[in-house]
């Protein structure tokens, strides 16, 4: 749901974030359709398949049996999904805003590079942040309440899927004809640091949530 909240939030807050098209009265979307399709195919499908062979946790036999009436996705899980989705959207839009003129967190000028180039850079930033945030969330989602660092390297298939996804994301950003297809542009080393730093917020938020759950249970 991270991409859903990103698109919805980007459209609703476009004026505050600088996600606008000069001279146009239409809606300017934060991410393109091809980018959203890439996110769904790349960061959702491969890690999800790899998580299907994730080893069981050590405390699986200590858990209470589920009731026949229990839902597969209960209220608490929906809350977790919405919470992480909102965090993903927030860091994605903040990353975009940092590279747009007229936003909340920057005083950049459009004249320096031109609006189209600036929007492409911002979209590439948001696109990349969301991809890496989804990968980190896949690691965090291995357990509902255990830290991501417990058995971190137990699932080699998941790490393989993440490595492949990261490599393909780099290809989309640096191969010229894919730049045209996906509306991306090469990023600087500093931009990569920003992307990874903002994506890490998802992992930190997930770890804090799990700490609270463990404290409440004890």
Where are the regions a protein language model picked out?
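Membrane-embedded transport module
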Residues: 1-145
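C-terminal transmembrane module of polytopic membrane proteins
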Residues: 52, 101, 128-218
